Amino acid sequence: MIFTVTEVTKMVNGVRTVVLWDRDIQEGQLVEEELAFWAQDDSGNVWLLGEYPEEHEGKKVSAPAAWLTGIQQATAGILMRAEPKMNTPQYEQGKAPRAEFHDLANVFAENQQTCVDIGCFDGVLVVDEWDPDQQPQDGHQFKYHAPGVGIIQVTALGGDEQETLVATEHRTLTPDELAAANARALELDGFGYTRAKAVYAGSPPAELVPRPAR
């Protein structure tokens, strides 16, 4: 999996979101590409307002699991609380009935030390995620969030098709790489108007909003 934060934004249900571009590459082949639409509120909570995943099967490309907040009863959810703590109520990360997406989460552990390929990290937060609409045996995912980096590891408990991931690289893109990522995110968003018409029809196109130079 390759996760890229782009300079592309998209208005979703009246909220300007940042567009993330994810790629799932297996044995050198692109299996899935996804746009995820994130936003942060004034309190510091990070929200998920929609996803546009494209599934690649040979030359066939489809997007059956696309969803946007406010369309087809889909609702936004919190990806990360501003001040995540243990022993607090579980929270919803989003719900989209037509896309069969529904995730709940809770803080499982705080201030952990976790070592992966890119190094060892202190202060790691472990978040337990699960789909309440699935059977208990379908399992849980545990995502390890390192301060200033993001997710560095994903482990699983139960389930036959759970993903496990370990971070192998974390870096800033070159200007050319960032430009290419922006272009691909805009292209994928454009595909949404033909491959996920029912979801995308009423949404404005994504647009490039370059970050201020540092």
Predicted regions and their residues:
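Beta-strand-rich cores of mature extracytoplasmic or soluble domains
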Residues: 46-48, 58-61
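Acidic, serine/threonine-rich low-complexity disordered tracts
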Residues: 1-42, 49, 55, 84-214
